[in-house]
Design a protein with these regions (language model features):
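Catalytic cores of alpha/beta
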Residues: 87, 132-146, 150, 157-158, ...
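Hydrophobic faces of well-ordered beta-strands that scaffold small-molecule active sites
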Residues: 75-79, 97-99, 125-129, 148-150, ...
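Conserved N-terminal beta1-alpha1 strand-loop-helix module at the mouth
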Residues: 52-125, 132, 164
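N-terminal amphipathic alpha-helix/helix-capping segment at the start of soluble metabolic enzymes
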Residues: 44-76, 191-205, 261
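Bacterial N-terminal signal peptides
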Residues: 13-27
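Conserved anion-binding
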Residues: 147-229, 239
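Active-site-adjacent beta->alpha loops and helix N-cap segments on the catalytic face
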Residues: 57-61, 103-117, 132-137, 154-173, ...
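Short beta-strand/loop segments at the ligand-binding rim of alpha/beta enzyme cores
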Residues: 65-77, 119-128, 201-214, 261-275
Length: 307
């Protein structure tokens, strides 16, 4: 047989042998590769030095959620500047840090560093986004925020969009226990390095959506909003603007009536009720925004270096 014919015959027989063996090879590979569920159950590698990894079999790495389930009140401090030493100190004695972007000049690059610093200090980072659009919410979640704070909510559509932009549309694809709604795209960026390799399939169960009720229009739709929108985790009575937009003050009969309406609706729907830390003794309130920077908490910004 000519040499070129022998080579052709060999290639044909070799190809046939691979076709026969392929099902067995694929089966072996499938049995060797862990399923998504098995990957979640396996102890993950620590994402960063000193970071608590996602525990084996655990789907909750947001400790605020754990504490709420335990019936605890949740406290925070608020930061409005980029000083990372202030951010570290802000974590002392509280459950989460409120990173203020609506009423500050913080850039997204600065906020990303603040989120990382807060997480590495053992605290949960929340971000009040400047606006409730997809771009701002995407940046906050990709940077690793586990609480998305939506200001001045006064429409059902705005609340629904806030939830959609905060959640992945994964449904039952990777995690059958994940809350399924969402329109968030899968950039992830810094978040997995902070919260571990199980982040993507567990994010929907760990990213909390907090809406702020600040004006009479928001008060008027609160019942419909909570009836129609699935995925609102926390509703906060934003006490200052609540009075500013209502033309009254805390303690006035009109103010108290609006606050009661919001409070009763939130509690009726089983949602966490939030307010300023000065309201910690009021019935029904479970989560609180603490003071800003060094106003009353006692932690001080890092002094400027001498020139």
């Amino acid at each position: 047989m000519p040499s070129h014919a022998r080579h052709a015959t060999f290639r044909l027989l070799h190809g046939l042998s691979l076709m026969v063996a392929m099902p067995a090879l694929l089966a072996a590979a499938a049995s060797a590769a862990p399923s998504p569920a098995a990957q979640l159950a396996a102890p993950p590698q620590a994402a960063r030095p000193g970071a608590p990894p996602v525990k084996a079999g655990s789907q909750t790495f947001n400790t605020v959620i754990t504490k709420l389930k335990e019936g605890k009140q949740i406290f925070s401090n608020t930061i409005i500047g980029p000083d990372l030493e202030v951010a570290k100190k802000a974590c002392q004695g509280v459950d989460f840090v409120w990173i203020e972007m609506q009423h500050s000049t913080l850039t997204w690059r600065e906020s990303q560093q603040l989120i990382k610093t807060v997480a590495e200090a053992g605290c949960i980072p929340f971000v009040r986004v400047p606006t409730a659009n997809e771009s701002d919410i995407q940046k906050a979640t990709d940077a690793g925020a586990l609480g998305i704070i939506i200001p001045m909510v006064d429409s059902v559509e705005e609340a629904r969009n806030a939830v959609m932009f905060s959640k992945y549309p994964i449904g039952h694809r990777d995690n059958p226990n994940a809350r399924p709604w969402g329109h968030r795209s899968s950039g992830q960026m810094q978040a997995p390095s902070l919260w571990g390799p199980g982040y993507a399939v567990n994010a929907n169960n760990n990213v909390l959506v907090m809406i702020l009720i600040e004006n009479p229009k928001g008060v008027g739709i609160i019942d419909d909003l909570l009836e129609e929108v699935q995925g609102i985790d926390i509703v906060m009575v934003a006490s200052n603007d609540f009075g500013m937009h209502g033309g009254d003050r805390d303690g006035d009969a009109s103010y108290n009536a609006r606050e009661k309406l919001v409070r009763e609706s939130v509690l009726k729907h089983g949602v966490v009720l939030a307010g300023p830390s000065s309201w910690k003794d009021r019935p029904g309130y479970r989560l609180f925004q603490g003071p800003r920077d060094a106003t009353t908490t006692g932690y001080e910004p890092t002094p400027a270096p001498p020139k």
